[in-house]
Amino acid sequence: MKKGTDLLKKGFAKMVKHGVVMDVTNVEQAQIAEEAGAVAVMALERVPADIRAAGGVARMSDPALIEEIMDAVSIPVMAKCRIGHTTEALVLEAIGVDMIDESEVLTQADPFFHIYKKKFNVPFVCGARNLGEAVRRIWEGAAMIRTKGEAGTGNIVEAVRHMRLMNEAIAQLQRMTDEEVYGVAKFYANRYAELAKTVREGMGLPATVLENEPIYEGFTLAEIIDGLYEVLLEVKKLGRLPVVNFAAGGVATPADAALMMQLGSDGVFVGSGIFKSENPLERARAIVEATYNYDKPDIVAEVSKNLGEAMKGIDITQISEAEKMQYRGD
């Protein structure tokens, strides 16, 4: 597939709409995912639950592992890079992955900025907890958004929170005047000024950033505001994000997947929920069926039977704020 333009990038994202993307750590798992009906796989060395348990620094996977998985399946293969780590993204583009996930599941590389994704030919997916994060990522060039949820927990509550926050923000945006929408764009743009403000404070200067001052990838604050405003106007007009929006972070059962689809998701990412369960192939098939038939409770009920033990979940209240992955990159 020829890659490059925003239209082509978004077109690839739409190709996986209504489907399930599954995390896989080896060729065998990738083949199970393909057999179960996954629309794509996410190739990585460890699923989020293992990344969470191991601690330390989580980085891009070995390119050799990703290439092995790419050679083993006929469906698209995605891979993760760290937030802001442009070089990891360039490596993934060089080996030919179909999409890059600039992911909070890995340790954040840049404390100030995300990758400027419009410089790349390969499409990107990024996580978002709310409309502000989604709009910033879309302006930077993301072709797909997903909820962050809380990866590796098997607990759907944070994914639900993020989808509801997104839906309510879009509903409120539609009731705003264009002038009010512009005010929202100015507020969302402030995140890009943090580096300049921090440097000025360190020099004993007022932490004020002028609108004609370049602050991110050569863009001035005014240009960023205008760019975010354009994205927000499109959201207001459409009543949804202008890109595909998937659910991710805590999906562990067919019912979880169906719930997220009912809340307006265009598809589902499943990380630890499949291969940390007792019967990965049957659970994977069931989640695919539930995602396609989310509005048919009888089918969701049928596919949920006799799947064996689901992954052991984690109560979100037992995770410290510092350990929550969702706060990486806003």
Curated annotation (Swiss-Prot):
GO BP of this protein: amino acid metabolic process; pyridoxal phosphate biosynthetic process; pyridoxine biosynthetic process
Active site per UniProt: 80
Highest taxon of the lineage: Archaea
Pfam families the record matches: SOR_SNZ, ThiG
Key words, A-Z: Lyase, Pyridoxal phosphate, Schiff base
UniProt EC number: 4.3.3.6
Sequence positions that bind D-ribose 5-phosphate: 23, 152, 250, 271-272
InterPro entries in UniProt: Aldolase_TIM (IPR013785), PdxS/SNZ (IPR001852), PdxS/SNZ_N (IPR033755), RibuloseP-bd_barrel (IPR011060), Thiazole_synthase_ThiG (IPR033983)
Pathway assignment: Cofactor biosynthesis; pyridoxal 5'-phosphate biosynthesis
Residues engaged in binding D-glyceraldehyde 3-phosphate: 164
GO MF annotation: an example: pyridoxal 5'-phosphate synthase (glutamine hydrolysing) activity
Catalytic activity: aldehydo-D-ribose 5-phosphate + D-glyceraldehyde 3-phosphate + L-glutamine = pyridoxal 5'-phosphate + L-glutamate + phosphate + 3 H2O + H(+)
PANTHER family referenced in this protein's UniProt entry, alphabetically: PYRIDOXAL 5'-PHOSPHATE SYNTHASE SUBUNIT SNZ1-RELATED
Function text: Catalyzes the formation of pyridoxal 5'-phosphate from ribose 5-phosphate (RBP), glyceraldehyde 3-phosphate (G3P) and ammonia. The ammonia is provided by the PdxT subunit. Can also use ribulose 5-phosphate and dihydroxyacetone phosphate as substrates, resulting from enzyme-catalyzed isomerization of RBP and G3P, respectively.
Xref: HAMAP family: PdxS
Family statement: Belongs to the PdxS/SNZ family.
Subunit structure of this chain's protein: In the presence of PdxT, forms a dodecamer of heterodimers.
Protein name, entry field: Pyridoxal 5'-phosphate synthase subunit PdxS
Source organism of the structure: Methanocaldococcus jannaschii (strain ATCC 43067 / DSM 2661 / JAL-1 / JCM 10045 / NBRC 100440) (Methanococcus jannaschii)
Organismal lineage: Archaea, Methanobacteriati, Methanobacteriota, Methanomada group, Methanococci
